[in-house]
Amino acid sequence: RDRSPSRGLGDVYKRQEDGSTSTREIVHHHGGACILPVDADGNITLVRQFRYAFGEEIWELPAGKLEAGEDPFEAAKRELSEECGLTADKYTSLGEFYPTVGYDTEIIYTWVATGLHETRMHLDADEFLTPDRVPLAQAYEMVMRGEIKDGKTIAGVLKLKALLDEGKL
C-alpha cells in the first residue's frame, strides 16, 4: 500500500511516556467546506444523496472536499451553487471542526448562508442528489430521531439551532 502523503496515507510514530513507540496510520486530507443555506422563512436546504459506503440515501448539508490550497470559503460558496442552485448575500462563519480525530487530518469549515437567490445547479458528472428545503425545527427533529446520520449535518443543525435559540445569530 502506498503510504506517501500525496496518496493520503502516512505513518506517524509517537513516543509514549514509558519510552515505547507506537505507529498510527494517518489519512492526510485537504479538508472540506459545508454550508447551511437558510431562507427568509427559516428553512434550511438539505440534500439527499446515495452514499455507497452505507448503501442508502443520506440527508446532508451541502458540502464538498477542498482541493490542495483551495480557500474554504470559496469552496463553500461553490458547493451552495453547484448542489443547491443558490447564491447568498450574507455568509456567517460557524467555525470549524475535526470530524474524525483518531486517524484523519480533515477539518470541515462551516458557514450559514442567508439572503438566498436561486441560480442554476451545476452537479459533477458523477453526482446525483436532490436538494430539499426543510424547516429548521423539522431538521432538528430529524437529527433527534436519528433520521439524519451524517456527522457534519448533525453538528451544523444543532449549532445553528443553539445559536438562534440564544439570539446569537
Regions found by a protein language model. Give the residues of each.
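Conserved Nudix-box catalytic region and its N-terminal flanking loop in Nudix hydrolases
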Residues: R24-V27, A33-R78, L169
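Short beta-strand segments
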Residues: T21-R24, D132
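Unchanged
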Residues: A33-C34, K65-G151
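Short helix-loop capping/hinge motifs at secondary-structure junctions, enriched
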Residues: N43, H117-T119, G167
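Long hydrophobic alpha-helical segments typical of transmembrane helices together
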Residues: Y140-L169
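Glycine-centered tight beta-turn/hairpin loop motif at sheet-sheet or coil-to-beta transitions
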Residues: E17-G19
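Single conserved hydrophobic/aromatic residue that forms the stacking wall/gate
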Residues: R1-L9, Y13
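Short beta-strand micro-motifs in enzyme catalytic cores
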Residues: G10-D11, E57, I107-Y109
